[in-house]
């Protein structure tokens, strides 16, 4: 049920007789001859609603009560269906392991983490569908991606083969300059006895180097092993210069809808802006832009 903008304070608009008895002029009060009635002598109907203005906090109030993130990173996760992409994200964001498999079309998760010097980093994690029928919709997720995680399951050699045949060509086509890391999921399967059916770590490592991935990490969402390492590696690769650089005072332009930017970072020809720290400038240049 939608919240009403106006709250009812008194009166009864559902009972017509009640309204008439309280506010309608009786026959004894009517003038005996037709004429113009004096407005100030007319009785008034009771007001059934009284307006109540909602309290909307100003930007300055929100800034005082909630610290705005210093950085915003968008990470897009791709790979074959059922390799464990959703479990990876839920395990990282919520700390739980989902037991039921529900195919994902598109799903977004947002979480804030704290950097080594107290910086607030907002992560926007985009889960995508690996099924072929969604191949035309999937590129919509790549816009403004800062990191691409191409995933495979250690229990499926086919999913690793598709990394080379399908996923790297696709993300390289749409995001040629965006950093890509290779992530192996379900590493807890190595505890089983049928190791011959599993992906050999050395094969995945050599593939990552050959394809130009900046990192290759295997993890287990069920056991929560190496989950944090996956995302910390992505963050440090992008923001290592920014997170550990000393903060220098700068003259900033206040904008309530965007992160503060320095005047020297505004391109007069295009109006584009970038934050003043060198690491984030590099991040903007490598951001995926879908034309």
UniProtKB/Swiss-Prot annotation:
The keyword Phosphoprotein applies. The modification Cysteine methyl ester is found at residue 288. CDD domains: Rho4_like (cd04132). A lipid is attached at residue 288 (S-farnesyl cysteine). GO terms for cellular component: cell periphery; cellular bud neck; cytosol; endoplasmic reticulum; incipient cellular bud site; plasma membrane. Residues 14-45, 250-273 are annotated as: Disordered. It holds the Pfam family Ras. The modification Phosphoserine is found at residues 264, 268, 276. GO terms for molecular function: GTP binding; GTPase activity; protein kinase binding. It is a lipid-anchor. It catalyses: GTP + H2O = GDP + phosphate + H(+). GTP binds at residues 79-86, 127-131, 185-188. A motif (Effector region) lies at residues 101-109. Keywords: Cell membrane, GTP-binding, Hydrolase, Lipoprotein, Membrane, Methylation, Nucleotide-binding, Phosphoprotein, Prenylation. Residues 14-31 have a biased composition (Polar residues). Gene3D superfamilies: P-loop containing nucleotide triphosphate hydrolases. It is found in: Cell membrane. Disulfide bonds: none annotated. It is an enzyme of class 3 (hydrolase). Plays an important role in cell growth. Required to keep the uninucleated state. May be involved in the organization of the cytoskeleton which affects microtubule functions. Most likely RHO3 and RHO4 of S.cerevisiae regulate partially overlapping but different pathways. Interacts with BEM4. Belongs to the small GTPase superfamily. Rho family. This is GTP-binding protein RHO4. It comes from Saccharomyces cerevisiae (strain ATCC 204508 / S288c) (Baker's yeast). The lineage of its organism: Eukaryota, Fungi, Dikarya, Ascomycota, Saccharomycotina. The gene is RHO4.
